[in-house]
Amino acid sequence: MTGIYIHIPFCKSKCPYCDFYSFKPDETQKDSYLKAVLRCIKENKSQIKAPVDTVYFGGGTPSFFGGERIRAVIDCIKENYTLISPEITVECNPSSVRDEFFEIISKAGVNRISMGMQSAVDSERKALGRLSGKDEVGSAISLARKNGINNISLDLMLGVPYQTMESLNESIDFLISSDIKHISAYMLKIEEGTPFYKMQNSLTLPDEDTVCEMYLHTVKRLSENGFEQYEISNFAKKGFESRHNLHYWRTEEYLGIGPSAHSFLNGKRFYFERDFNSFLINPAIIEDGDGGSEEEYIMLSLRLSEGFSKEKFKERFGRYPDTAIFQKAKELEKHNLLKIENETISLTPEGFLISNSIIGKLLE
């Protein structure tokens, strides 16, 4: 199975922490971009040999693109690719969705939405540049459900300005009471070139130890309320994991369309140049080397709670992994950073906090 990612590089306003490629467009630019995306979908038809089972509209703010344009993209994908029981996700900003939007995309086949809540505390949302309050998030959830979209994911951000354990619990309470199916919980990362990067010395942020405590607390509370952690930053009710993102973490194939969108097809990684006008006129594809190596497979497998399996590695590469990996893992297991069961290595929540370091030690 293959996934298709559609990048919508449009936002009503830029959040101060965001490093993704996006800008505020006019209606003419939206229409021009739609034409370019439809053309690109058709031109890349020959690249995909397997059926498509996920389509993901990310951004930017796909909901700012408009329901009719999203429907046109989905219709084009259906006309040019074989879709089998697809999970079709659209990222939404609560401030840019209305009843009509959900009605249009639901009829087009969208069955999952992901909303950038970040925090349910309005003072924290304001510091993050969010245009809507907590009540608008709740209203957007209700509108989605009214139009038959019940698979809803919300983002939660840890370590944001002014956040405390008390305010974090307020956000978690909101997530749990909303009865949603999926939660992505990310730690705030200050990216170079963003307003937060310039402001970082004046931001009131929780210290690193507190953020780590917040992460472990979030894992515990979500687990107690029916959410299974299936990846470092992702939690789902049973059967509601993001099928599209699992393509990435399981080194499965996917096609990315749009400026800055990445692809992995036929063992090769490539991406489109991070330039809107270039994509409209003559999309420049930049090769990014081979993908799916043994090392990459191990690294991505260890992001998942299911972990790195000796037998699955053999199925993939025709041989067992180096025994040294399991020898090193036994030492780390003593410190509750990972566990070894049935010849499978998986990280604990404490291990996820320092996953880059652990993976580096296992592979060195």
Which residue ranges define each predicted feature?
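Alpha/beta-hydrolase
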Residues: I6-I8, M117
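N-terminal [4Fe-4S]-dependent radical SAM core
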Residues: M1-Y5, I48-P51, Y81, I354
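C-terminal scaffold of the Radical SAM
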Residues: M1, S22-E43, D53-R319
